[in-house]
Amino acid sequence: MVAIPRVAAARSLARQLARQSLRTTSFASAPVRIAIASTPLARSPSSFRSLSSSTRRSAAAAAAAAAAKATPAHDDSHTPMAVLTEADLGRLVRQRNVGISAHIDSGKTTLTERVLFYTGRIKDIHEVRGRDAVGAKMDHMELEREKGITIQSAATYCSWKATPPTEKASVSGDAANVESKELMEKKQDFHINIIDTPGHVDFTIEVERALRVLDGAVLVLCAVSGVQSQTITVDRQMRRYSVPRISFINKMDRAGANPWRVIGQIRNKLKMPAAAVQIPIGAEDDFNGVIDLIRWKAVYNEGHKGIDIRETDEIPAEYLELAKQKRAELIEQLAEVDDEMTEMFIEEREPTIEELAAAIRRTTIRCQFSPVFLGSAIKNKGVQAMLDGVCSYLPNPAEVPATAMDMSSAATKKAAEEAAQAAGEDQEAAAEARKNAAPPVLPLSPASEAPLVGLAFKLEEGKYGQLTYMRVYQGTLKRGNLIFNARTGKKVKVPRLVRMHSNDMEDVDEIGAGEICAMFGVECSSGDTFTDGTTQLSMTSMFVPEPVISLAITPEGKESQNFSRALNRFQKEDPTFRVHVDKESNETIISGMGELHLEIYVERMRREYNVPCTTGKPRVAFRETIEKKATFAYTHKKQTGGAGQFGRVMGYIEPMEVDPETGVDTAFDNRVVGGSIPNGYISACEKGFYDALEKGALSGHAVTGVRFVLEDGAAHSVDSSELAFRLATAGAFREAYQKANPVILEPKMTVEVVAPIEFQGAVIGALNQRKGTISDTEVREDEFTLTAEVSLNDMFGYSSQLRGLTQGKGEFSMEYKCHTPVMMNIQKEMHEAYRKKQTEKK
């Protein structure tokens, strides 16, 4: 085997420092699932003994912390039962919920097609773009097969007999892992739920809601292009929901394939510690197989479409030194993020296969490391090993913490009182704390007998009505059961329950905790929580980005009911697709994440609803904001004979940063004390503030990034009303807005261009003409990748220009980054145009 690399200097001092660090480091940061009433570890002493001593300490500490956190927040009547039975454990440890995500054209759907073939879910392999008149199974929409891209995420499930990292027992080392030695001594059947997601940034909401409900992910990267713009977006989404991932470097057969450069990009661009668990045997056209660095075997795909695996202990001589070097690198990377591996490294002790595999699993589940697999999906190589990695290193549903807010009146009241007490004797602070107190958060357990808790994460219009995709986090969902929508309070019967296999369905009678399913006939919205009615729990929904582009749409001929029906359906399915009617022009305006996003919906209206439409020129989603604080003291007073209108408000507005978790960037803050404004008028003030945000004074676009603080005011016993205070607040905002240095914001895009090296100068020149700022350039043998920041308003027509500049050989992608102030000359032009337009109306 391979010798551990020696530490350079000061060996004895390094040992002392490392041991001191080990003694003071806590393992409680590892994701640990604890059952409240009875932990699986407490009821499985044999499994508990099989864990390392440090893991036992970690489990005990985590159990105590979880109990301490859960107990005071709520009373026993609101505590969900969370007893995991042996049957639950046996089912959960062999289950994985994973998503396959990547930049566009990295080979996600091609990879998923091979996964379905090797697991026996499909009888033959079909390619993307419908080259064989069939098309990939997961791209079931006609538009997807025509364009060769995934537009909607698609769910499926399969079973896989996984080869463990070692033929001997593999102890996980994670407190929540209850997989016994017997389980790992031979191949075991794993049940895998898979969601194949789009790679185009315009459909990023599909990735967002998939990752919200998944326990792990496969991040696919191209061996040539490496980390690209959408790869960075997907990485950010995975971090938002703490989703562990393994990495799969695809297209190892392509000219210019360089997995080591890609691994370097994972570490440097994504800031994720990573190392290969395989090295390639050959490259490009000669890519032949891989060497497993953990089991120390050469692995080859043979037989019909690579279905047979041949393994040998004979490592090709020309790859032996590289294999030793990369295995040492793997150990070094793990030693940087795992304390047990650090201790072995310092002591110069070679880890066993079991210890190495356990360290990979431990650090992967903690989102501290990503093992990297290699292969070529199109050449049917390396896919089975990646599947083994999914089963070996990604968590089961019991190992991923899930929580829900207790919205019961008793729990929320108790939380409010505790927050008020913590604020001290200051009555104003106590009232504010009571108002802003968050509901208590309870841990969920994937126990089949626990009260049902599930999250609806995706809606589709099916042949038999609305199809609602749901992840069951706790309890059991059964066909015919009554379930309760936590948002609306309505109860509904589940008439039909199915498992999805792309667009095919398999009827089932029940779905257990940790599973993904779909329901027919259940009206709801994306992000709704469902329970069995015995609890009042609600889960947090997913992050929804704001649209960045709009266009006017008009049906050809007479407007029909189908036009409205299509728009309503698309809005319900896709939270990033928005529709409104412009009050001035009376035009129907659709908004989305990009030109392709809106183009797809316009085409779907024609095909699915027989409503051809004409569209106007795309409009950029400009916004307005303020740059400094400004005070207001505004009185709305109107006398018309009889009861008049009177309302006085005082306070200030100030800039507000966007909340990275929720995306919220506007807020109304009531700090009125003493009843100077009666409580009944406060909600009217809030409505007036949000009325004023709809149109800014500079360009008529929506105002964002503002906090409105209401401090004082006055009311009249006869003339004051809700309308008076609503108008007073809107007037106060407009008055303060002019003093707060308002600016117009425009969407800034991160643009990535890939083209042959001979066109580099022309591409850079074109982006400079569009006022782009180049942030990164990477040159390879015969092509280059250029990253720049360009205003969306300057990107219209770029696709045609790039084709002309590169003779059709260049391609680009762009992703929304942020809104930034426009240049002052542009702001003046936009302001003058808006003023002129307003004057003409009068």
Curated annotation (Swiss-Prot):
Transmembrane segments: none annotated. Residues 423-442 are annotated as: Disordered. Pathway: Protein biosynthesis; polypeptide chain elongation. One of its GO terms (molecular function) is GTP binding. Its main location: mitochondrion. InterPro entries: EFG_II (IPR041095), EFG_III (IPR009022), EFG_III/V (IPR035647), EFG_IV (IPR047872), EFG_V (IPR035649), EFG_V-like (IPR000640), EFTu-like_2 (IPR004161), P-loop_NTPase (IPR027417). GO terms for biological process: mitochondrial translational elongation. Keywords: Elongation factor, GTP-binding, Mitochondrion, Nucleotide-binding, Protein biosynthesis, Transit peptide. It is found in: Mitochondrion. GTP binds at residues 102-109, 196-200, 250-253. Coiled coil: none annotated. Mitochondrial GTPase that catalyzes the GTP-dependent ribosomal translocation step during translation elongation. During this step, the ribosome changes from the pre-translocational (PRE) to the post-translocational (POST) state as the newly formed A-site-bound peptidyl-tRNA and P-site-bound deacylated tRNA move to the P and E sites, respectively. Catalyzes the coordinated movement of the two tRNA molecules, the mRNA and conformational changes in the ribosome. Belongs to the TRAFAC class translation factor GTPase superfamily. Classic translation factor GTPase family. EF-G/EF-2 subfamily. This is Elongation factor G, mitochondrial. The gene is MEF1.
